[in-house]
Amino acid sequence: MSQTNDKPALHLVPSFYGVYILKSIPKPRRTYIGSTPDPKRRLRQHNGDLKVGGAYRTKKDGSRPWTMVVLVHGFPSRIAALQFEHSLQHAYQTRHINNDARITSSSRQSSMHSKLANIRLLTTSFDKMSLKIAIFDEEVYRMWVENKHKIECNVPCTLFKFDEFCNSIQEIDIEDAKNILLGKQLDCMVCKASIDYFKDSTPNISSREELSNYLAKGNYPLIGICGDHAFHLSCIARQRGPAMVPKSVTCTTCGQKLDWSDIIKVSTRLRHYVVQDSLHLAITQL
């Protein structure tokens, strides 16, 4: 393993990551599929408004300007988004679409109806993630509602104005959670065990493997905050029933319904903050 890859690292669930479809304005039948944590900036790159970035395919043949028409978002990692992106680009062969359900049989450019149908098919394979779909074009939204290929999809889909949607994307704020954690001794409201995030002594850790082994022993477990209460994610996740990952959980103290994707975003950042400070590490974000 290289020295760079062996540095201590923790996974942070991104504030935002999405897979998008662009449509060329001068050549409406031409489309492009990509992924990004910043849709507004990425569109500017594709259109040449920013000198750095973009993609060769969106620069050539008089296809500019482009407009973003569809954005699937809510991915828990860049890797998950890239998997969805690759599957949407290669819907004719991806393992994430069952052969008997496949509607795209070749790598040739497919219609917007087909792309929307493939999104519907892919969400079944990615159903453990709290995905949502934003559409920024009224005609494309009409196609989604029409559902030409009659494929069921339980992922919420909403028509937005592009700029308004992008302006609504916010970084995850953990200040309130930090204040609760620092303010008093917390017990898990499910198992009642003390949440020990502040230790009298900590080991010297210099590698990713050492940090992984230390956390695997139960040190700095992922925790969630609701009001001034806390819980181990492993405890409250038992509400999930047969699902591997819950879509939401209910606070056992106040009864509030909590979105799992929001909980995990705060939880991974809170642990990153405490571990980095307590172990005196410069931790890489995965």
UniProtKB/Swiss-Prot annotation:
Gene responsible for this protein: SLX1
UniProt-listed HAMAP family: Endonuc_su_Slx1 (MF_03100)
GO BP annotations listed: double-strand break repair via homologous recombination
Coiled coil: none
Subunit structure and binding partners: Forms a heterodimer with SLX4.
Highest taxon listed in the record's lineage: Eukaryota
Keyword match Ribosomal protein: no
UniProt domain GIY-YIG: residue ranges: 15-98
Protein name (database record): Structure-specific endonuclease subunit SLX1
Enzyme Commission number(s): 3.1.-.-
Intracellular or extracellular location(s): Nucleus
Keyword Transmembrane found: no
Any one GO CC term of the record: Slx1-Slx4 complex
Family: Belongs to the SLX1 family.
Class of this enzyme: hydrolase
